């Protein structure tokens, strides 16, 4: 293919069941990546994870799954882990953002590797957090300074368009806003998609580019 960057799933994203990666599997992956010339590689964590939830059972599962995902990324030598900001199931957005950020910070503190956590922008459907750049900025600001270099943003073009950022009509303006609110240095990855929803619809529906 000639690809120089890739994103994978290290386990089934729709299941809680964890996957152990053996040393042999990890070594084989690292060799294959080097031989293929893939310079940047990372993972997207489970879609079930919600570090902003107020449900104790779901939160416990989410913490375990997120930490296990970080460990697999480290074992495979991946550069980044994309994660969603979660859903404020109790309706308190500020509390959800704070809880998510603190749990990410805890995971980074316990794992002194190089894997960078990238918070993905969302469309803002339902109680989804992170559809405004300011919400993601609030999360990053709660991460201690010593770990700040290991947290960034994954900008999903379909999501930000549905959230009301007019990439179609004012691409440069959106990037300027991103830079003003978050800092362009936080941009670690772009998910390039078109949107089935209209501008500002807050519908999380991807479409093929073009």
Question: Where are the regions that the model predicts?
Answer:
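Hydrophobic faces of well-ordered beta-strands that scaffold small-molecule active sites
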Residues: 4-8, 41-45, 81-83, 117-119, ...
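Active-site beta-loop-alpha junctions enriched in small/polar residues
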Residues: 11-13, 45-48, 86-88, 120-126, ...
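Short loop/turn motifs at secondary-structure junctions
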Residues: 2-4, 37, 77, 113, ...
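Active-site acidic/histidine proton-transfer and metal-coordination neighborhood
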Residues: 51-152
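Gly/Pro-rich active-site loop or hairpin
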Residues: 129-133, 137, 161-210
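N-terminal pre-domain/capping segments
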Residues: 1-45, 49-71
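Alpha-helix-loop-beta-strand connector modules within alpha/beta enzyme cores
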Residues: 23-43, 100-112, 139-144, 210
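Charged helix-capping and loop-helix junction motifs
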Residues: 21-27, 63-66, 97-102, 132-136, ...
């Amino acid at each position: 293919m000639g690809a120089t960057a890739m994103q994978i799933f290290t386990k089934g994203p729709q299941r809680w069941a964890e996957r152990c990666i053996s040393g042999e599997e990890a070594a084989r992956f690292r060799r294959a990546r080097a031989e293929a010339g893939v310079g940047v590689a990372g993972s997207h964590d489970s879609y079930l994870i919600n570090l902003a939830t107020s449900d104790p059972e779901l939160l416990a599962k989410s913490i375990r799954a997120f930490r296990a995902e970080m460990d697999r990324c480290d074992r495979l030598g991946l550069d980044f882990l994309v994660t969603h900001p979660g859903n404020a199931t109790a309706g308190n957005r500020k509390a959800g953002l704070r809880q998510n950020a603190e749990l990410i910070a805890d995971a980074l503190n316990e794992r002194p590797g190089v894997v960078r956590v990238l918070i993905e922008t969302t469309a803002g459907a339902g109680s989804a957090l992170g559809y405004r750049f300011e919400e993601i900025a609030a999360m990053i600001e709660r991460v201690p300074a010593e770990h700040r270099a290991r947290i960034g943003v994954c900008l999903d073009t379909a999501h930000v368009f549905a959230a009301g950022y007019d990439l179609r009509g004012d691409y440069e303006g959106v990037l300027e806003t991103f830079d003003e609110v978050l800092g362009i240095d936080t941009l670690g990855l772009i998910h390039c998609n078109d949107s089935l929803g209209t501008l500002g619809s807050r519908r999380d529906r991807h479409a093929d580019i073009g």
